[in-house]
């Protein structure tokens, strides 16, 4: 199901089933432990997400009238072609530190594959530090206590992971994309932040 560009009576985006579309890709994963206290891992999801034939119903002059615009072989909305993750895991006795960097490629906000209506690619890094304490003698039945701290987005990247688009044709004469008003909305993600946690096992 994909959004057509039309709205319901209460303003919700209408969707339709696109028969001539496909998603094709591969997932890769690898890991390596060169030392007893060090593990390196990575994974990648690579895909192609295509609508072979798509009709956008674009509003005209902010009105309830629509104009059909046809697209051939456009990319499905919110479908990045690459998602990459890398992990560096250092662990010694009860102390564990995990460095995680991820990358997400460009995502289009609608099915027109218009670069002006897209989320730029982004990358961000988190670090998780934890310490596991197992008392020699159980205290009130306590088996283990894990103290953790998450350092999120440590490089304070400014990026958006989701968003939306509203577009209307201002002049119904001529090419529909030459005189078009577009309004973008982005959902920004948090900058650098710290979270702590405590987990207990009985």
Regions found by a protein language model. Give the residues of each.
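C-terminal beta-signal and adjacent terminal beta-strands/loops
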Residues: 105-108, 131-202
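Glycine-rich phosphate/pyrophosphate-binding loop
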Residues: 1-2
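Gram-negative outer-membrane beta-barrel transporters
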Residues: 5, 10-111
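Residue-level preference for beta-strand/loop junctions
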Residues: 22, 80, 121-123, 143, ...
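Outer-membrane beta-barrel proteins
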Residues: 15-20, 116-121, 185
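Outer-membrane beta-barrel architecture
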Residues: 39-41, 85, 92-98, 126, ...
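Short, surface-exposed loop/helix-turn segments at secondary-structure junctions
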Residues: 112-117, 142
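Transmembrane beta-barrel strand/turn architecture of Gram-negative outer membrane proteins
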Residues: 32-34, 43, 124-133
């Amino acid at each position: 199901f994909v959004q057509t560009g039309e709205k319901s009576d209460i303003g919700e985006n209408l969707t339709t089933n696109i028969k001539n579309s496909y998603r094709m890709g591969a997932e890769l994963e690898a890991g390596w432990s060169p030392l007893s206290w060090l593990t390196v891992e990575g994974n990648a999801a690579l895909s192609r997400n295509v609508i072979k034939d798509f009709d956008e119903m674009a509003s005209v002059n902010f009105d309830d009238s629509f104009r059909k615009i046809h697209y051939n072989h456009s990319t499905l909305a919110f479908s990045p072609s690459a998602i990459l993750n890398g992990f560096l895991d250092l662990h010694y006795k009860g102390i564990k530190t995990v460095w995680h960097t991820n990358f997400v490629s460009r995502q289009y906000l609608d099915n027109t594959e218009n670069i002006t209506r897209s989320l730029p690619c982004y990358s961000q890094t988190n670090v998780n530090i934890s310490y596991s304490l197992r008392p020699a003698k159980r205290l009130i039945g306590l088996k283990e206590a894990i103290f953790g701290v998450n350092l999120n987005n440590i490089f304070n990247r400014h990026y958006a992971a989701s968003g939306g688009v509203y577009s209307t044709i201002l002049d119904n004469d001529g090419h529909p994309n030459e005189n078009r008003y577009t309004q973008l909305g982005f959902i920004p993600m948090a900058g650098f932040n710290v979270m702590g946690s405590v987990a207990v096992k009985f």
